[in-house]
Amino acid sequence: PNRMWGTDGKQFYTRKEGLCWLFSVIEHFNDEILGWHTAKIGNRFAALEPVRQAVKQNFGSLDKDVVKDIGLFLRPDHGSQYDSNDFQNEIKYLGLNYSPAFVRSPQCNGIIERFHRTIQEQVFDIYVFEDLEEATKIIGDFIEKYNHEWILHRLNFMSPIEYRNNTQITEKKIA
């Protein structure tokens, strides 16, 4: 855990606001969504929100260099949000290592791309959202279910949380 996180944005539609954004951060170790944020405007500030959530949840603060000595890499694509000075400065401030996906190589960020495909199929293709508030609630419910109940072949048929907890128990027994 805490070696590589992926992040990306995904657009979806609401009747009231039109196109909106979901930004997510995923843990490559177990596919757990560590942070997510919905917004009408998909700018660098919206893209930073789930990164901050993930850092605060896992390391307890947003202090300067809070993850510097961990060796944690953040892998975004080359979207303008991620290439912006504000985004770059914030991840440097937090101590995250920047590891961008290769240009025109979505498989480089395949973990988050796969999650976005899943949420597209399970949420965005099924629901017609009235507004961003309704979308945020339904997306949040799905992410909660995904983290705790979504069975993934790659994780030996466990959910992301179950895999993390099972791995921590195994590591403690070995130690």
Describe every region a protein language model picked out.
Residues F73-H78, K92-I111, V128-L132:
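RNase H-like polynucleotidyl transferase catalytic core
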Residues L22, N43, A47, R75, ...:
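Hydrophobic (often cysteine-bearing) scaffold residues that line and stabilize catalytic clefts
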Residues E27-H28, T38-F45:
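A short acidic/small-residue loop/turn micro-motif
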Residues V51, D63-S84, F102, M158-I161:
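Acidic/histidine-rich, metal-coordinating catalytic segments
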Residues D8, E27, D77, N109, ...:
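Acidic active-site catalytic centers that drive phospho-/nucleotidyl reactions
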Residues E32-W36, Y98-A101, D125-I126:
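Short small-residue beta-strand/loop micro-motif enriched in glycine and branched aliphatics
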Residues P1-I26, E32, L48-Q53, Q57-K64, ...:
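Mobile-element integrase/transposase regions
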Residues N85, K92-L96, T118-A175:
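C-terminal domain-tail junction helix/linker
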